[in-house]
Amino acid sequence: MVQNFVPEAVRGDTRVLLVDGEILRVNGHPAAFRRIPSGSEFRSNLDQGGTTAQAAIDEGIERSVQRIGPVLRRDGLFFVGLDFLGDKVCEVNAFSPGGVRAAYRYERVDFTSELLRLLVQRWTTT
């Protein structure tokens, strides 16, 4: 895949976990975290030396999720991780979303139990 360079990449990206097209939240806390590149590296991937930090879900990300959520739901993508550069989606992680533990580190709520509850609910009602 080739894409134009997005200047926001130098400040890192935000991973947001979605379930059934909506941000996974527990007690109002979003399952999300920031990935920050190290040094002169623009990629924020942890394997490239990036670090994590608490994320803020702003209106731009909320609007993007509202637009893409119904498409994910329609296509049967129940649990995904969306990576954002600013308010632009730069990657959809559909097969291995990852990040529940990192989100817990900053929000200190049990996203795993809620995710499992929603997965069981999904598979027992369909």
Regions found by a protein language model. Give the residues of each.
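ATP-dependent carboxylate activation and anion-phosphoryl transfer catalytic cores
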Residues: 55-126
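Phosphate-binding site of ATP-dependent enzymes
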Residues: 1-61
